[in-house]
Amino acid sequence: MKENRKIIHIDMDAFYASIEQRDNPKYKGKPLIVGGDPNRRGVVATCSYEARKYGIHSAMPSLTAYKLCPKAIFIRPRMEVYKKVSRQVMNILNEYSNLVEHLSLDEAFVDVSKSKRCKGSATLMALEIKERIFKEVGLTASAGVSFNKFLAKMASDFRKPDGITVITEENSKDFIRNIPIGKFFGVGRVTKNKLNNIGVFKGEDLLKFSEEELIDIFSDRGKILYEFARGIDNRPVNPYRIRKSIGKEITLREDIEDIDEMIEILERIAERVSESLCLLNKKGKTVTLKVKFNDFKHITRSITLEHFLKEQKEIMECVKDLISIVDFKNKKVRLLGITISSLEENIITEEREQLSFDV
């Protein structure tokens, strides 16, 4: 399985925002933010590259984004449209291999090791896929090509937007040595800080530690760090990857109608959901709020972000955005719930932490 593998990672560029700019020419070239209203409890789902120049990023409170760029255009997500476009992209990928692992609406791994397309060249296939996505869907994508999933994912992030990077066995060591440790796939803020504390700032710094030393410091995560630093990742591309969700809900002892009281309860639910994500080594892109009224009718509201999350802070930013668009119609609430879906395995498990709530 490890010999002669050819893995492509396709990552759509600013997917939601790019679709909106494609469908609405008036948005092209302008700072566009897909997410919540800055005048209410809103959160940025994603934004155009024009908006990113101002320091705006996914999961940022919409009000903060507005302060950074008052001229930004804010629009609500159109999830059904994004799902339809995603299917178009994935259908293209499926023509190149039956081993396509969908990570989310906007990214996937493709194992083309046995594909005869483009004379068997993974690089040419990646270029052709990018060209077809642009011609048939009207969007750009970035591609990473390598001999395993870790390096293919790292490569696709290297030249965004609309780039392609190829990492071979010959150049992989140099590539990894120069990558900031915070850019390593699966290394979050907590692990990054812990690595910095032992003098690890780039991939090359990890090479100074033996496998035993890293395991001693990071437990099972140490073995993964040791292997990633050496370009080792034997995980197969899994087309049957099971989509799951993690959620918690609370039936209230007394029906309530005060929004601030609901937020306080949702904070506790979000904390429990975050703990479950950490324990199960998961993170997700889609946050769903469930509200059941005292007449036993219920509604759900969802938002899908561009990046994966697991921390209570980020979950609550989304929940506050979602509850702001719920029409309570003067009805009291008897149940509240939060679910995280579109899950991705957290390759390197983050240690549990006390959140500092800094953005």
From Swiss-Prot:
Gene this protein is translated from: dinB
Record: active site: 107
E.C. number: 2.7.7.7
GO cellular component: cytosol
Role this protein plays: Poorly processive, error-prone DNA polymerase involved in untargeted mutagenesis. Copies undamaged DNA at stalled replication forks, which arise in vivo from mismatched or misaligned primer ends. These misaligned primers can be extended by PolIV. Exhibits no 3'-5' exonuclease (proofreading) activity. May be involved in translesional synthesis, in conjunction with the beta clamp from PolIII.
Highest taxon of source: Bacteria
Compartments it resides in: Cytoplasm
Cofactor note: Binds 2 magnesium ions per subunit.
Biological process terms in GO annotation: DNA-templated DNA replication; error-prone translesion synthesis; SOS response
Name of the featured protein: DNA polymerase IV
Main localization category: cytoplasm
Signal sequence interval, chain numbering: none
Molecular function terms, GO-annotated: damaged DNA binding; DNA-directed DNA polymerase activity; magnesium ion binding
Sites annotated Substrate discrimination: 16
Keyword annotations from UniProtKB, A to Z: Cytoplasm, DNA damage, DNA repair, DNA replication, DNA-binding, DNA-directed DNA polymerase, Magnesium, Metal-binding, Mutator protein, Nucleotidyltransferase, Transferase
Quaternary structure note: Monomer.
UniProt xrefs under Pfam families: IMS, IMS_C
EC category: transferase
Residue positions binding Mg(2+): 11, 106
PANTHER family: DNA POLYMERASE KAPPA (PTHR11076:SF33), DNA REPAIR POLYMERASE UMUC / TRANSFERASE FAMILY MEMBER (PTHR11076)
Family: Belongs to the DNA polymerase type-Y family.
Species of the source: Clostridium perfringens (strain ATCC 13124 / DSM 756 / JCM 1290 / NCIMB 6125 / NCTC 8237 / Type A)
Co-factor(s): Mg(2+)
Catalytic activity: DNA(n) + a 2'-deoxyribonucleoside 5'-triphosphate = DNA(n+1) + diphosphate
UniProt cross-references to SUPFAM superfamilies, sorted A to Z: DNA/RNA polymerases (SSF56672), Lesion bypass DNA polymerase (Y-family), little finger domain (SSF100879)
Domain UmuC positions: 7-188
